[in-house]
Amino acid sequence: SLEKQGLLKRTHGGAVLNENALNEIKIPFLIRELEKSDEKIKIARIAAELVEDESVIFLDASTSAYFMIPFLAEKRNLIVITNGIKALTALSENNISCIGTGGEVINSCLAFVGEEAHRTIERYNADFCFFACRGISEDGRLTDISQPENSVRAKMLEHSKQAYMLCTSDKM
């Protein structure tokens, strides 16, 4: 039942959503891709304008970073390193030089994580890192539900000169 899964809480005469539990659900990439897509595309266009030709870029496995790819195709001689499986396909389709981190796959996120991903990231020093997360807490901390993805993201940030969080209005 939804109550046993912690998604609903019974009340007198009905049930209410457990908001905390909803924040812990891994929403599949294909669904996240549809959420706020117009806003993500606008953000992606602006973010891609920051990138110069011949840059080395880290993109995380977020849908927000994924939406940057068509706009990055307008740049010359980029190298993009990503842990995003769907991003690798889109980068290839747009003739952008790309490197996949490899590693263990999180199926719902279509993301590579783990030590193999870390080792690949450590071999590069990127000009830019573009990433997203589940939200921002009241005290300004980035929140997400996937510790393995957080770890990969942290490694990307550590090896980047500049980092930009791609954030839709619902995450603030």
Language model region names:
Residues 3, 10, 88-172:
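Conserved phosphate- and dinucleotide-binding cores of soluble alpha/beta proteins
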Residues 3-58, 69-75, 89-96:
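HTH-adjacent hinge/linker in prokaryotic transcriptional regulators
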Residues 63, 85-86:
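Alpha-helix/helix-capping structural signal
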Residues 78-81, 98:
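Short beta-strand element of Class I
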